[in-house]
Every structure is written in C-alpha cells, then in structure tokens.
Amino acid sequence: FGQSAGGRSVKTLSASPLARGLFSKAIIMSASGLATASPSSSMSAYMSAFAPLTLEESEQQTKEVMDWAGLTDLDKMRAASTEFIFSLGSIYQSVTGKRTWMTTGAVSPMVDGYVLHESFDDAALNNNLANVPYMIGFTLNDMGNMAPGIADFCLNREQAGDKAYAYQFARPLPTDGRENVLKGAFHSSDLWYVFKSFKNSWRPWTEGDWDLSEVMLTAWTNFARFGDPNGQQGGQWAPYTSENPRFMIFRLDDNDAVNSEMGEPLRP
C-alpha cells in the first residue's frame, strides 16, 4: 500500500521475485500504471524519468557525475558533504543538460538481476508480476492523466487472471477563499480521505467530506482484509475489465469537477 513514490515502491515489490508470498494484495495510489503499453500517454514521458536502470548503467552514470565533480576516488567522495552529494545530480544536469538517476533521487529502481530481474512494465507484460488483487488509481488533478496507463494495467491483470480495481478521486478540496493554496483534487489530496485525517487541516470540511472519507476508508480496509473493496457482502465496485472498463469515481456529486473549474472527471 503506497502513494506516489510509495506507489512506485509497491510496483517494484510486485515485480520482485524476492517479495513473492510476502503480501497478498497491493494498492497503488498516484503512481500511474503501465507506461510501455501506452507510449502516447501524457504520463509516459514523466514515468520514463523513473524507469529502472541496470546496475551497470547506474554505476556508469554515477561515475560520470563523480568524475565531472572531481570526486575521482573513494577518499574524495567520503570527504564531500552529504548536502553536496545529495544535490550533485541536479547541479550536473543544470550545467551539462544531461539527466541521470541521481537527478530523480533514489526512486529509480535498479534492475540488478537479484532483487529485480526486470522492470515493473516488463514484468507485467511478461506475466511475471505477483498474482494478487490490485487496487490502483489517481486524483483528478494529479501530476498528469494516469487513466490510460491504469486501464492498460488492469487489462493486463485481467489477462493474467488477477483482479484489478481502478478508481479516480474527483472531489476538489474545499477552501475558505484564500489565494495561493492548492485547489482541486490535487496530487495527494485523497490521503486526507483515506486516513480520515481532516482534523489536522485548516480546510473547511463538510459533512459530505466526512461521509466520503468513511466510504473510502471502508473500501481501503475491505480491500486490505478481503482483496475486495466491497467487502464480503459485495457491492458496486467491480474490477476493471475488457467487458467492464470502468473506474470507481470518488466525489460528492456530479457537479464536483464542474464547480471546481479544474476539468471534467472520468465517467463511472
């Protein structure tokens, strides 16, 4: 269960043979789906920045950056400050125009042949992902349109015999009229609802927000317990399949996205 970079961690664990049998369900929040299956998707370029590298590729990129910075041996590297090493990738890119794994930080997994034999996308396309139920989704005003990649992933899981439940969070967060605040259903906004942590925020939450949070918290809990967001009694949220290509839309009413002036949500 993870969101954003945490969602990418879930994807990595799902692709790692060393993690087999260590988890029985997986929730991927705001980490897109498949990138290679939809190369024209607006998220493909973004997700490619986090594409796994081989161990040899990552070592070569690291050496290039260190040599450029004059850190040509271990003594010099160890003498450099943590802050300098941490920022070195960004400095290198701004000066040279070259992007490395050090630019994106430690969120790009390494295909080392041990923990990872292949990328998440390749593992999915080669039917080497963990065969567990999946819940996967994003927010209306996320970092990009993740719907195509998520749909492709769900169809891929259908072919593998796994269930995959897709969702979109489309409730624009309420504001008190102040400027310079995040608006809409932005990246990470759904976490307030999943954890029902409204009391830790200044936003003027409504009774409807509390009700929506209860619905989402129940769905996440049911999925964690039963592998089905509906629970043992069943419900309206069916897996995304070729015959049922539908996302569950979490919002208060049909006017949510229109009123927010942030764009139209997906249709359930």
Which ranges hold each PLM region?
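Acidic helix-start/capping segments at beta-turn-to-alpha-helix junctions
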Residues: 2, 82, 242-245
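Mobile gating loops/cap/lid regions near enzyme active sites that modulate substrate access
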Residues: 139, 157-268
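Surface-exposed, flexible loop/turn segments at secondary-structure boundaries
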Residues: 6, 34, 85, 142-143, ...
